[in-house]
Amino acid sequence: MKQSDLQRLVERVSLQFFKKPFKHTATFNPRLRTTGGRYILQTHNIELNKKYYEAFGEEELIAIIKHELCHYHLHLEGKGYRHRDQDFRDLLRQVQAPRYCRPLPQQAQQRTKKVYVYVCSKCSLKYRRKKRVNTDKYVCGQCGGKLMLDNGGEI
């Protein structure tokens, strides 16, 4: 999908679901990584993540466009355009737009992080940490015993 196709799609969705024209620019932003799209308050433009179109197709892209158009139209009307505002939530429900977009497949893989488990050699108390701990510097907070890395640190 080209930029011109995207612009026409956003204009069509705006007229179809909101009965109002979209008079600004919609573009794909390759720098977006964790969000489906964003509405720029200063310029009134909408930026969308092309990875969502490639991963889930046009249906998911239209859902993201509807969400961003809710921000757009409410902001131009001077109403509550933020996620926490009741005007925004009501309009989302009215046009059946999602509040959040689905996570991309590669995002789900990135969340599985290593967990380090340290065990006290005296009282056997377990400590779970995301980062490695210098066992020469730190001791058990309960009894002062030496900490040992358990099972190579993975769970």
From Swiss-Prot:
Which is a GO BP term held by this UniProt record?
Answer: response to stress
Provide the alphabetized UniProt keywords.
Answer: Cytoplasm, Metal-binding, Zinc
Which cysteines share a disulfide bond? none
Is Ribosomal protein found in the keyword set? no
**Annotated GO MF terms:** zinc ion binding
Tell me where in this chain the SprT-like domain is found: 6-148
Coiled-coil spans are none
Cellular localization per UniProt:
Cytoplasm
Q: Kindly give the InterPro entries that the UniProt entry links to this protein.
A: SprT-like_domain, SprT_Zn_ribbon, Uncharacterised_SprT-like
One GO term describing the cellular component: cytoplasm
Keyword Cytoplasm annotated? yes
Which positions are catalytic residues?
Answer: E68
Cofactor dependence: Zn(2+)
- Domain of life according to the entry: Bacteria
Q: Where does Zn(2+) bind?
A: H67, H71
Hey, which family's this protein in? Belongs to the SprT family.
Which NCBIfam families does its entry note?
Answer: PRK04351.1
Query: What's the protein here called?
Result: Protein SprT-like
What is the originating organism of this protein?
Geobacillus sp. (strain WCH70)
